Amino acid sequence: MDSALYHSAGIFGAPSASTGGSMIASSKPLAFSIERIMARTPEPKSIPFPNLFQAPVGKAEPKQSPAPLHCMIPLMPLACEPPHKLHINGLDHPDTFAYNANELLSIGLNYKNEQQDAAPAIGQYKLFRPRVVNQSSFHAMGAAVCYLNCGEGACPPHAGLVNLHPMASYLLNTPLHARQKSLFSSEKSKQGAVADRCPPGVSFKELSHSHLHHYMKESAHILSEKLFKNSAAKVNSGSPQTKPKVFTCEVCGKVFNAHYNLTRHMPVHTGARPFVCKVCGKGFRQASTLCRHKIIHTQEKPHKCNQCGKAFNRSSTLNTHTRIHAGYKPFICEFCGKGFHQKGNYKNHKLTHSGEKQFKCNICNKAFHQVYNLTFHMHTHNDKKPFTCPTCGKGFCRNFDLKKHIRKLHDISPGPHSPPTPTGNTEGQ
């Protein structure tokens, strides 16, 4: 994994006779520069990664030797000359390949001379690939530059290696997009990258060649996997969405998303109607239904039918009434095919097919399908009859019975000021 880039001697001068073709010493080493490359573009762009496993065209590796590892990304240059470091004559080394400067620029790599600000001349650069794993440094232009395998033990933090990401360290000081930079600075990403690949305290020299090759292959794709899994990353990185709480009725199995709705539903099975109208004695399960019901005992009917002129106290009642003129009966009984304008009437009719009459009178044992029918029946056992005929003064428990009485006996159609029709068959459901 240890490699470096350096200038060919042909660019900076021919090798001297005293050195015998070795690299020419220089007062300062060449520095790695990303800022110059990034400054040429108006907007920061992500830097493409080099192909770490494909040898240059025309340069085949010997079949008998193991496949060498590319490490084209130099880390932070350090001035260190430990005696165990291997000094390599890069010009004569068999594992060097010539690269054109344009090819290096295309992958985002560039060298600049610290003594001058000018861009390097277009020429030939040398890419050194280590023959063995422990070839971790070499003398470039007379100064020791440590790269990936700096030291005998595990790679030290001062070498600029970001969490054993050999391709990530040089990106931290570049004007990358914030999302790209966060992929390298995230602590979770760092911990996950090292967990299974490089045990702590293990030297790179102790790792097998195949292990390093496998690690480099995974590291090369670590960024692309994170960048292009946008949707999956947002889903997986966020906290798991908890399912909404549900409340199930133990009697009928109906499911509600709030406990309040379940509480409102339970009187359907118990038959309790604690909210009673003081005018007609009709009971309701909810206080809001009772408030709407009280309107029928007033003379306020702002909603009128355009076809027959009949007035209603609520717009919903008018909408239901218009179905009569249109002949629209959306609620069809699946047993007999009879249609109904209102859903409440449809439900009441279905009970006639089942024969079930669970609401019984405690006095006469008469049974009813609906609890509101039992409520009206109870008026027959007392003297309370809220609906009175204006002509003869006869009282009725229900407004429906009063209207029938007026039409049959007095031959008068109910006018706008006649007692309004209760809507208990729909409101109490």
UniProtKB/Swiss-Prot annotation:
Matches recorded under PROSITE patterns: ZINC_FINGER_C2H2_1, ZINC_FINGER_C2H2_2
A GO MF label: zinc ion binding
Region (Disordered): 409-429
Similarity remark: Belongs to the krueppel C2H2-type zinc-finger protein family.
UniProt protein name: Fez family zinc finger protein 1
GO cellular component, one term: nucleus
GO biological process: cell differentiation; nervous system development; regulation of transcription by RNA polymerase II
Domain of life, source organism: Eukaryota
Main location per the UniProt record: nucleus
Short sequence motif Engrailed homology 1 repressor: positions: 29-44
Cell location: Nucleus
ZnF (C2H2-type) residues: 247-269, 275-297, 303-325, 331-353, 359-381, 387-410
PANTHER family: FEZ FAMILY ZINC FINGER PROTEIN 2, PR DOMAIN ZINC FINGER PROTEIN
Taxonomic source organism: Danio rerio (Zebrafish)
